[in-house]
Amino acid sequence: MLKLLLGDPNTRKLKRYQPIVEEINFLEEEISQLTDDELRKETQNLKSNISAELDFKKQKELLEEFLPKAFAIVREASKRVLDMRHFDVQLIGGMVLNECQIAEMKTGEGKTLVATLPCYLNALTGKGVHVVTVNDYLARRDAEWMGQVHRFLGLSVGLIQQDMNPVERKKNYDCDITYATNSELGFDYLRDNMATDISEVVQRKFNYCVIDEVDSILIDEARTPLIISGQVERPQEKYQKAAELSLALIKAKELSKDGIDPEGDYEVDEKQRSCILTDQGFAKCEEYLGVNDLYNPQDPWAHYITNALKAKELFIKDVNYIIKNEEAVIVDEFTGRVMPGRRWSDGQHQAIEAKESLKIQPETQTLASITYQNFFLLYPGLAGMTGTAKTEEVEFEKTYKLESTVIPTNQIRKRQDWSDQVFKTEIGKWKAVAKETAKIHRDGRPVLVGTTSVEKSELLSSLLSAEKIPHNLLNAKPENVEREAEIVAQAGRAGAVTIATNMAGRGTDIILGGNSDYMARLKLKEILIPLLVKPDNEHKPPIPKQRNSKSKGGFSRKAGSNLKKKISNSSTNLFPCKLDEVIEKKLSLLSDELVKNWGDKQLSVLELDDRIATAAEKAPTDDKLIRLLRESLSDVKNEYEKVLIHEEEKVREAGGLHVIGTERHESRRVDNQLRGRAGRQGDLGSTRFFLSLDDNLLRIFGGDRVANLMNAFRVDEDMPIESGMLTRSLESAQKKVETYYYDIRKQVFEYDEVMNNQRKAVYGERLRVLKGIDLKRQVIGYGERTMIEIVDAYINPDLPPEEWNIEQLISKVKEFIYLLDDLKVEDINLLSIEELKNYLQEQLRIAYDLKESQIDKIRPGLMREAERFFILQQIDNLWREHLQSMDSLRESVGLRGYGQKDPLIEYKNEGYDMFLEMMTNMRRNVIYSMFMFQPKTDKNDKN
């Protein structure tokens, strides 16, 4: 009723932006008259005006005032550099982001281009802007691609990548706009708060941040906190023994009901992702291990056995992890990418290593941790973009205080979503997928098949190979990851078949007919790698042979002499045509020139990538070689374009890209993301999901209704089932999962919120110390607090002064401050409590000055260094112990629900008391260490 009376709130919101859009359009003509240098000058003028204003509120008002002009400048720069003009709806998207909201824009509507608008505007403050993407590949692509606009306008652009050292990181964070992944930002924040010297801190104070694929980062990844850990020694043979034992245990066929154990040694709850031993299982384990109690604190076994069972039942090779270089490497469940260097905690990773007979790495202990929710709430300005935010609108609002606004599409969507096909068994489903893929491929349309795991993508690959359908495979396996740019470049060509694991997180548009820009880059890379790249980098040839009925994909490790041969084999698959002789000759001359100037095989693959990417930009350059490279790229691109333009027409006539989903994801949003790959910007396209009653979603969350359906359908495995009841079961299963995971995230957030206030206090204190601000006053402050605490502990104000325990008080004071050795009972006997506190504080200050003069005789400034060292040492050690105590408290506090107490309130109260105790210990330890500090002096040592 309200909606009818007031109209749609989203439409009302969009109307508000219309006058500003008109103002930007009005400015367009005026701005287009400016030369490139004048545009850059405008940027400098805006920057000096805005960054000069120090008051936060007034600066915000200035940004609002200059918004139309700034957006018009970016639009003009983008036209000149990228040949892309922001549509009116994209300008609205930019304004929504500038107001720290979430802009929901459909796939292919140019989210990446929209981000340039608010990033440019907020970078004018000089405080830095972060653009966050889900993976290194996208961060790099956006920094190279959209970064051109900012660089053209005279702003500096930084990029954070996984393998950068701290010096490179600092340089990149100091830029006006920095592109990075969510995990790199989070880990750098934690590392900065473990730094022992201010020079090790790489990040600046946070200012404004735009998150691309915001739902993926703030929702999907919010269940797992970021953790930095250190190694602790644990007996490794226990992992091996538990892994052997897990193989001897028998899984129960069903879960326990009404407290009655099922038949079997352990039950597996896939919904909760847990394994629980039955009474029979406990007895079997105790007998096998020769122990009386698996929970004996002196010789605990339960934890090892549970982890071994989880490794056996819930962590599956080529789904949750892959084996690479004799190590178990985690595969990100949302993006399908490997995460080298990441490990599961609580001994789970060690259990997997034992299961796979790999070398068991030492277990780890948490040194620092934060959830993505609390990390991103540290930004004063936070905005995000996604194709699908409405499904999670409530969560964005509640957790992050972020509104969502749906931005209308620029052109009407022409995509057709065909009805789901459900099969009784999984093998029936895969056969149907292969059949439909083959049919669409023969119609000359490109096909993208989304799978949920490495294992499933390889199963489909073998089915297509049997049908002799050439295809490309994009999953977490290293040999496929290295080909990502190449695979995506040709995914839109006529009849191309691409199998991708969780394409949803890949954020790369598939251009119908193929991407001539990427192909030109790859062609140059193919020619230059053998000449310019160091041989040890050659194990990554850029263009391995495309899969067909004979090849199993991948490539051999022996590169070198085979490299050119391999590349020439594959060229026919990748490139649309042979280059004419004039261009070939030009490329040959270019190669000679580059070898002469850049050296024979002197570059790494990344360095060559960087130079080719710079050449592909339109930003002005003084480098003669980059200009030559740019010319050649343009020639090759134009040559390919001639062929691809016909191919694009053919693909459009055939019906555009067809997307096949092979399993419903736990979240409807991820399904919509996959669908959104087809039909971008008004293109034709179609999608279909193939499902089976064995799929995880239906099996785990579908309940008994689906199990009964399975028995009711007496149909062949390759016969699709269509039923309204089944569709409803699917919908309700997805809603169930979404609610279930929302509750988990809410709980993670609520508990981390308690830690968050403590973390802010500790990290704030640490930063002050690192900067060396008033260290002496800080330590004396610790001492004064300690004196007050000693007086309060030993003197009861309700007793008369003659009954006060003055002697014990004095011995406690001397314990902390040995320089007060001559303090006597008669000195303080007649003082009131308040006078006593003041007297002891005064004595402490005198003693501290005395200590400082002793230390500074050895070396001036040594006292300040000692203060910093001891405060940091105590904060770090005690914080680490505190994190473990809080973990233990969190595990135990859940049981208090049985006693009618709210576990969260109990956790808050006890956590607060533990924190106060930690801070008290820190102050006391620092003051004690400072007075006990006796540096060794060596007469021969000038240092």
Curated annotation (Swiss-Prot):
<dbReference type="InterPro" id="IPR000185">
    <property type="entry name" value="SecA"/>
</dbReference>
<keyword id="KW-0813">Transport</keyword>
<dbReference type="Pfam" id="PF07517">
    <property type="entry name" value="SecA_DEAD"/>
</dbReference>
<keyword id="KW-1003">Cell membrane</keyword>
<dbReference type="InterPro" id="IPR011115">
    <property type="entry name" value="SecA_DEAD"/>
</dbReference>
<dbReference type="InterPro" id="IPR014018">
    <property type="entry name" value="SecA_motor_DEAD"/>
</dbReference>
<dbReference type="GO" id="GO:0017038">
    <property type="term" value="P:protein import"/>
</dbReference>
<dbReference type="GO" id="GO:0043952">
    <property type="term" value="P:protein transport by the Sec complex"/>
</dbReference>
<dbReference type="GO" id="GO:0005829">
    <property type="term" value="C:cytosol"/>
</dbReference>
<dbReference type="GO" id="GO:0031522">
    <property type="term" value="C:cell envelope Sec protein transport complex"/>
</dbReference>
<keyword id="KW-1278">Translocase</keyword>
<dbReference type="Pfam" id="PF21090">
    <property type="entry name" value="P-loop_SecA"/>
</dbReference>
<dbReference type="InterPro" id="IPR020937">
    <property type="entry name" value="SecA_CS"/>
</dbReference>
<dbReference type="GO" id="GO:0005524">
    <property type="term" value="F:ATP binding"/>
</dbReference>
<protein>
    <recommendedName>
        <fullName>Protein translocase subunit SecA</fullName>
        <ecNumber>7.4.2.8</ecNumber>
    </recommendedName>
</protein>
<keyword id="KW-0067">ATP-binding</keyword>
<dbReference type="GO" id="GO:0008564">
    <property type="term" value="F:protein-exporting ATPase activity"/>
</dbReference>
<keyword id="KW-0793">Thylakoid</keyword>
<dbReference type="InterPro" id="IPR011130">
    <property type="entry name" value="SecA_preprotein_X-link_dom"/>
</dbReference>
<keyword id="KW-0472">Membrane</keyword>
<dbReference type="InterPro" id="IPR036670">
    <property type="entry name" value="SecA_X-link_sf"/>
</dbReference>
<dbReference type="InterPro" id="IPR044722">
    <property type="entry name" value="SecA_SF2_C"/>
</dbReference>
<feature type="binding site">
    <location>
        <position position="90"/>
    </location>
    <ligand>
        <name>ATP</name>
    </ligand>
</feature>
<feature type="region of interest" description="Disordered">
    <location>
        <begin position="535"/>
        <end position="562"/>
    </location>
</feature>
<keyword id="KW-0547">Nucleotide-binding</keyword>
<dbReference type="GO" id="GO:0006605">
    <property type="term" value="P:protein targeting"/>
</dbReference>
<comment type="function">
    <text>Probably participates in protein translocation into and across both the cytoplasmic and thylakoid membranes in cyanobacterial cells.</text>
</comment>
<feature type="binding site">
    <location>
        <begin position="108"/>
        <end position="112"/>
    </location>
    <ligand>
        <name>ATP</name>
    </ligand>
</feature>
<comment type="function">
    <text>Part of the Sec protein translocase complex. Interacts with the SecYEG preprotein conducting channel. Has a central role in coupling the hydrolysis of ATP to the transfer of proteins into and across the cell membrane, serving as an ATP-driven molecular motor driving the stepwise translocation of polypeptide chains across the membrane.</text>
</comment>
<keyword id="KW-0997">Cell inner membrane</keyword>
<dbReference type="Pfam" id="PF07516">
    <property type="entry name" value="SecA_SW"/>
</dbReference>
<dbReference type="GO" id="GO:0031676">
    <property type="term" value="C:plasma membrane-derived thylakoid membrane"/>
</dbReference>
<keyword id="KW-0653">Protein transport</keyword>
<dbReference type="Pfam" id="PF01043">
    <property type="entry name" value="SecA_PP_bind"/>
</dbReference>
<dbReference type="InterPro" id="IPR011116">
    <property type="entry name" value="SecA_Wing/Scaffold"/>
</dbReference>
<keyword id="KW-0963">Cytoplasm</keyword>
<comment type="subunit">
    <text>Monomer and homodimer. Part of the essential Sec protein translocation apparatus which comprises SecA, SecYEG and auxiliary proteins SecDF. Other proteins may also be involved.</text>
</comment>
<keyword id="KW-0811">Translocation</keyword>
<dbReference type="InterPro" id="IPR014001">
    <property type="entry name" value="Helicase_ATP-bd"/>
</dbReference>
<dbReference type="InterPro" id="IPR036266">
    <property type="entry name" value="SecA_Wing/Scaffold_sf"/>
</dbReference>
<dbReference type="GO" id="GO:0065002">
    <property type="term" value="P:intracellular protein transmembrane transport"/>
</dbReference>
<comment type="similarity">
    <text>Belongs to the SecA family.</text>
</comment>
